[in-house]
Amino acid sequence: MKEILPGLYILRRDRLATSPPSQEPLYGEKIVDGLRVWDPRRSKLAALLLRYPCLEGVVPSGKVLYLGAANGTTVSYLGDILTGGMIYAVEISPRAMRDLLLLAEQRENIIPVLGDAARPETYRRIVEPVDLLYQDVAQRNQAEIASRNASIYLKPNGLMVVMIKARSIDSTARSTEIFDEEIRRLSGVEVLRRVDLPHHRDHVAVVARKLR
């Protein structure tokens, strides 16, 4: 077992693990030797970190704006390694927000935000400047949403990770063409790396850094 980031371990070659504050599973996941198994086949962030552990400088004490939090599964793993940090988890679905609120009752470093990531100005009173912007949304204008949120909330030199979903943008064009176009549309950032995600068809992760 190898620690690749503070609190994040490679458990065998194809699994990650975190050190949770509680030994009780949150979503039916396995607990092995006190570590919480994180399956990259089920989480795009886990798939990215297994190939490119890009969160150095963010964990363990950074602030994160997470767009597209859904019911909070990946948010909870990120919370495990942000032991001294904070996650602002933005989700538009009231049903998913109920799950996020239950999660936040167990994790003090998660703040659920019911809101539309395409309207970042609506949560200005809640979200502070952040060290990482993480986006996993299904809207068509994914690059625009990421760029607008980064311009408001991401600190200079802050890290941005965008999971681009090709089929949410265009169901007919080739995925590679969609990825190229969305990356070109990102503004105010320098793209550091584009990472293919095994087990996540028609998705790619884009890692970028905000310009000063």
Swiss-Prot record:
Which Pfam families does the protein's record reference? Fibrillarin
Q: Does the keyword Transferase apply?
A: yes
Q: Which residues form the signal peptide?
A: none
The record ties this protein, via InterPro entries, to: Fibrillarin, SAM-dependent_MTases_sf
Nucleus among the record's keywords?
no
Gene Ontology molecular function: histone H2AQ104 methyltransferase activity; RNA binding; rRNA methyltransferase activity
Instruction: Give the family this protein belongs to, as stated in its UniProt record.
Output: Belongs to the methyltransferase superfamily. Fibrillarin family.
Q: What does this protein do?
A: Involved in pre-rRNA and tRNA processing. Utilizes the methyl donor S-adenosyl-L-methionine to catalyze the site-specific 2'-hydroxyl methylation of ribose moieties in rRNA and tRNA. Site specificity is provided by a guide RNA that base pairs with the substrate. Methylation occurs at a characteristic distance from the sequence involved in base pairing with the guide RNA.
Instruction: State what protein this is by name.
Output: Fibrillarin-like rRNA/tRNA 2'-O-methyltransferase
The organism of origin for this protein: Methanothrix thermoacetophila (strain DSM 6194 / JCM 14653 / NBRC 101360 / PT)
Q: Which gene encodes it?
A: flpA
